């Protein structure tokens, strides 16, 4: 793992997989916060809905309604550009060089410890088909890796 080039005002573990360069989207809840969009940062989760409700993400091209949703679907409908703009703004807000959040007395309210959170399925999946459940597909895949006579493994 390469060291992070961006510095955050949030204390991050040295070996974190979630520095400012890698902010993955997800959905989380806590006992006092219902399911909402969040982004991992170190061993924390950034509460995106709370940031949006406080007016920090207004210029990113994603509506506050979409960011308040309990799933990522509405946000993702905005395309890569919207997600990229949000990620760039989160990098700016949580950068050590940006005073916008870090100088606020309530700055820690925008963060939740991952260990105290429950993660949820991040999107509503509308129409998934498992093609491998078809015997024909299983046979065709089996022939790619085994002798055609042994394409299906019978247990």
Residues of each region from the PLM?
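Extended, domain-scale alpha-helical bundle/helix-rich regions
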Residues: 126-133
